[in-house]
Amino acid sequence: MNTLEQTIGNTPLVKLQRLGPDNGSEIWVKLEGNNPAGSVKDRAALSMIVEAEKRGEIKPGDVLIEATSGNTGIALAMIAALKGYRMKLLMPDNMSQERRAAMRAYGAELILVTKEQGMEGARDLALAMSERGEGKLLDQFNNPDNPYAHYTTTGPEIWRQTSGRITHFVSSMGTTGTITGVSRFLREQEKPVTIVGLQPEEGSSIPGIRRWPAEYMPGIFNASLVDEVLDIHQNDAENTMRELAVREGIFCGVSSGGAVAGALRVARATPGAIVVAIICDRGDRYLSTGVFGEEHFSQGAGI
């Protein structure tokens, strides 16, 4: 490997040792935090920029625009720095300090909208900026180069790493790029694989997973590629995230906890299943939020 972009992908797939049910099923997780900018979004970020370059839509020195809740923005900021683009990122102001700091460290310009405006507001502002000629909108929510990254890399890797044994694929749904691309690839293989998507329960807030209003449903989403959608409560996602750290040694974020909570639900209901879930990022991106309970230790509680 000679360049940073060549280190994106080919992430490890590991079997959970202690959290899975004792019914002959197996839960395997793909450690996307091993990508250079720390998340599964490295794949889509690289794909959206490289494919746009191939079509002659952008060139180094151009301004790129994107709305993000964090991971895509960090990944795009990394690729923009690597390739010589100027990156403008729109993000709600209730996202973690680590995300803001990482984007700025890569040299991106960060524009915050209010938490009340949310991702919908960030998307609207990104579109308006693009229409005013302030830069090229990459539009991860409607850009087919997003799922294409997972069709050409993530899906084939999972199939190869499980030697085709996979029976269920479980993925949190945000932009839906991961589940759409992986499912499309798995649908083309010689055996059926059940595709399970995850969204937050009504009233739950899980960073990186969305329950989109109909008018904001990502254009890349193809409902025919998803067999089942599970609702995940915020508490289940957070508790599973913490369990992964202390029982499996896997330090990940809340949406990854949600994915594994869903995988556990599938495995318990399906003896003998080979379930694969995506660990989409690392836990260090969430420390300032207190979700791991570290604020109690800083106050001396429990010591």
UniProtKB/Swiss-Prot annotation:
It is an enzyme of class 2 (transferase). Pathway: Amino-acid biosynthesis; L-cysteine biosynthesis; L-cysteine from L-serine: step 2/2. It catalyses: O-acetyl-L-serine + hydrogen sulfide = L-cysteine + acetate. GO terms for cellular component: cytoplasm. Its EC number is 2.5.1.47. Gene3D superfamilies: 3.40.50.1100. The keyword Transferase applies. The modification N6-(pyridoxal phosphate)lysine is found at K41. Pyridoxal 5'-phosphate binds at N71, G174, T175, T176, G177, T178, S255. GO terms for molecular function: cysteine synthase activity. Two cysteine synthase enzymes are found. Both catalyze the same reaction. Cysteine synthase B can also use thiosulfate in place of sulfide to give cysteine thiosulfonate as a product. This is Cysteine synthase B. It comes from Salmonella typhimurium (strain LT2 / SGSC1412 / ATCC 700720). The gene is cysM.
